[in-house]
Every structure is written in C-alpha cells, then in structure tokens.
Design a protein with these regions (language model features):
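Soluble extramembrane regions of membrane proteins in the secretory/endomembrane system
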Residues: 1-212
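Core alpha-helical transmembrane segments of integral membrane proteins
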Residues: 204-233
Length: 233
C-alpha cells in the first residue's frame, strides 16, 4: 500500500491509476497497466524518458516553446542536453500572472509543467510514499527519495535499501519471467508497513474491493467508448 499526497492510504494500483490519468489521460498505456508504467518509469527512467506518453493537446504549444508536434511528448523533450528545463522561464512568467489573466496557452503550459514535475519527482524517488515512520503519530509516510535521516538503526537500513532491491528484482523478473523474488521483497514491505504504521492499513478485503472497483471503472469507460464509436458508424 502507499500514502497519496492527501494522506490517504490506498492500493498502489489506485495511486498509479491517478498518476497515469493525470499524465496520459488513461488508466493504461499500450496494453500496460498504470502500475506497470509507473514502476517501469522508476526502474528505467532513461527508457521511459524517450517514450511519448505525456499528453498535451494545445496545437500552439509546440511552436511557442520549441516542442515536438503532436498530442504526446517525451519527458526528455523539455530538457536540453545539459539538463536545463527548457520551459522554465515561460512557466515562471505564467505563474507570475494572476490566474484569471492567464491565456489558454499559458494554462496548458502549466498543465504540462505539472505532468513533468510529477515524472521528475518520481525519477528523484519522491511522490511514492511507502514507509511509515516508527512512533510517528502524525501518520506521515516517506518516499525513498525523501530525507530519511528521521529513521534510525535497522529501520534506516531497511527504508534506504528495500526499494532499490525491489526494482532490481523486478528488472530481473522482466527478463526471466520469474517474479517470486520480487514478490518476496514486496511482502517484506507489507510486513514493515503493518508493523510500523500509526494509520490503519486497508484490509485484504478492502484492497480487493478497491481493485475490483478500479477495473470495473476502466471497463465501464472502455464500453462507453466503444458505444460512442458504434453510434458514429
């Protein structure tokens, strides 16, 4: 399970669905689930940085900010070879203007900036809060890329090593087709969460129902899409 920015504890699947919908406007990408896409980005940001899956639909935006044409751009499209953020000045200028006075182009630029910031945060190990802090009654969980100096002893070692370990096992599993070791690492995370979280975790039944709801919602919107296409034919 994971803690979303609002503080809710929820299945990773629910959280990654929200992230991918924000970035790509869909729960799936070319047959991959949201969880596969987001975990894939964590595993191999260099690969996913070259995949055009960041949606933007303003036709003026590419020409205005020297970006590729089309509805989707790559993460690396907004960075120069030296790592500079190419739309930084334009974003700052848009934010300096009162919201009511921003043009449609500026509003869409800020939407793109939000999507890029989500992916950048994930690349830095943030926005993926998996670790409760022992004895912390505030209920805050921490991401692998956060300042983990608040942990001590064995807890410090665990939270700093477990995610790289899992991503390594998942990478191996993609090549071998054997997910047993990756599953064991996930089980270790779950045990840690159950033991250390001051906030009650979802029960297995609650998780199952939420996953069912996620898939049912996806099926509903897919069916509506097919129905709309049928009406047009």
């Amino acid at each position: 399970q994971i803690q979303c920015p609002t503080g809710r504890i929820e299945p990773v699947d629910t959280y990654t669905d929200k992230l991918l919908r924000k970035i790509y406007r869909s729960d799936t990408f070319e047959g991959l689930s949201s969880e596969q896409v987001i975990i894939g980005f964590l595993m191999n940001p260099s690969y996913w940085g070259n995949i055009p899956f960041i949606r933007q639909t303003n036709k003026e935006l590419p020409q205005a900010y020297s970006l590729p044409e089309g509805k989707y751009i790559r993460f690396f499209d907004v960075f120069s070879e030296d790592g500079s953020y190419l739309i930084s000045d334009a974003v700052d200028k848009a934010y300096s203007r009162p919201a009511a006075e921003r043009s449609r182009l500026e509003k869409d630029l800020l939407k793109l900036d939000e999507k890029i910031n989500i992916l950048y945060s994930l690349q830095q190990g943030k926005m993926f809060a998996l670790f409760p802090l022992p004895g912390d009654t505030s209920g805050k969980w921490y991401s692998p890329g956060d300042d983990l100096s608040v942990y001590s002893g064995k807890d410090s070692l665990f939270v700093s090593k477990i995610m790289p370990w899992y991503l390594g096992e998942a990478s191996d599993a993609l090549r071998t087709g054997t997910w047993e070791s990756a599953g064991e690492v996930l089980s270790m995370m779950n045990v840690y969460q159950q033991k250390q979280s001051a906030t009650p975790l979802l029960t297995e039944k609650q998780v199952s129902w939420e996953l069912f709801y996620n898939k049912a919602r996806l099926f509903f919107w897919s069916a509506m899409g097919y129905m709309a296409v049928g009406l047009l034919l």
